[in-house]
């Protein structure tokens, strides 16, 4: 599992109570302005778009994947990847894999890089970009089944429990599939579809061109498959066989995709037969406008319409005036110049902020797709007409900049960028949802039940669907997926356009990206209520819970301890041997993964008095506790601790008193396991005998991520240290003066910076908190350093430069 990324870098502090503050440079959502001609740092935007594609990676992740909260997915309990075709990208906010959108997206990404390679390389993003393209290309290659046949869809597209009915993170999705279906392999289909085969041929031809000099053997394999797939697509000339894509991606035309593929195969091979095929077979069948002999210039580039992409490629290759004029019509149509130029009017609407809004469903993907074509046309087929080139280029820039905040809402529709962004995002893994209840995500309130509203992760670089045709972005919910979803095809043309923007305006990627996120909530947790009590016993009903999201995961060896004091038992003349610990009812039956063995009492060695013992609840296989649903994320066990009512006929009255028991604190007042008052930090949970939740009676506390190998740093003695601003430091990093250094100190710093009227740090606390050695007082940089210390990334405070 690629869990070690969790400790590979350090993030900005995630605040308690939802407080928003300015964080260290590069860790915020703020998009830095470019010092040169452009309005924004387009290299940063491109860098973050690559991050989004890495979030979408399925299967065993490559070492270069930089997403700190992602891990391997679609693997069985033995660690084997089980999809019939491994790897590839998840399509959108779900976990389907479609060869169609993988091929289309990788092709548009490749096109952008190939046209603006020097600029992307100069920005230092070339290797990262090619890594991500190759991930998509290799999936397409593996999906080829020969003679034009392709694996079309991988995912739960049959039966009642389909992919879209499941809301959980990618890392645990296959466990939910297994729970529902009893196996570890997702369904797939093999289809004969000209669109899928042709787009696959196109991107494999591009792969040959991209990698023929650095990996000639792999490049030749790409080209061989590209030729075969093109032959199959041309032979089928049909798009009706869509298999599991039905209702999601209903392909409709083939000639555009075959022409697009033929152009790329010609560029890859120089074989004129591909141009001959275009002229003899595809141009005569090229789509036309309704009730007109004009070639179709309306609508726009998308996964089901590569008409204009094919036309632009053909115009570039041949230089034929009629095709150059055709592209001119298409761009003017998008600029809504129809009435003045003898063209059909734009089918959508131009918003007050200048967005050419084609349709409510992913409007920004359509606008940025066309922006890429317009910028490329300006740089190639229109380059000798400076007025036209500048005009079209300016329009294209406006569509891209609209996404970053030059719009009616002053909102960035690119996540993780800008001061204001949409709050409801249709993306399962980014949400970190553990109980399959997602309706309140991004809303102000979780309702009476307190459902999760906060996202676990920032989905940096993802282009969201966008506003309505008035330029308004309403109070959308996650279910309004036309506006709130993200997808690999949404980012494709946008990313290609960014390559052109970097070519025009330059830019620099962030040096400290991506940040590692600090968990926003406890990943492992215990809750308990009183299930029954009497003069001689206490019966507890407890939940062991898995709310992991950094990354989402399961663990096999899980146990927890309930601590109790035996002093009154001993005072009554009884011995520890008279105490009985026994299991009662529980969620899983004997022999099942989630079944627990209840045992004890065991002496707790951390109590010098010798009076603290504990009952242990150990699960047969804790992987049953998985963050995939309302019943799966927790495992309920009821257990009783008791003494005999009488021994040798003598009552034991007074021998049992739970009021001084470490774990009993709060239990008597807890009302419901579903409510916050039942959360019990004095019942400690362990993974592989490592403390992951709670506090032991001797004060030992769990460390976030301990089950991933993150260990607490040793405390540095600082009693006589001087702060950079003068004065004695009692303990470096201890901003709240509780004698410890942990995340609470970082949180207090950020809260104080955000709301100093409400959150106070004493003068002594400020001395302790100034750990970044910059001599600038207490800043967000100090919180940043404290996090690194808590995560074990630095060994002492203050930080040494």
Task: Label each region the model flagged.
Residues 506-537:
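Low-complexity, acidic Ser/Thr/Pro/Gly-rich terminal tails and inter-domain linkers that flank the onset
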Residues 3-25:
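Sec-dependent N-terminal signal peptides of Gram-positive bacterial secreted proteins and lipoproteins
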Residues 534-566:
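Short beta-strand elements of extracellular/lumenal beta-sandwich folds
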Residues 36-51, 55-112, 153-199, 203, ...:
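Aromatic (Trp/Tyr) and acidic
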Residues 19-26, 711-801:
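Cellulosome-associated attachment modules in secreted, modular CAZymes
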Residues 606, 610-613, 625-627, 631-712:
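Terminal connector regions
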Residues 197, 201-211, 219-267, 298-315:
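Aromatic-lined, polymer-binding surfaces characteristic
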Residues 567-621:
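A surface/secretory-pathway sequence property marking extracellular, secreted
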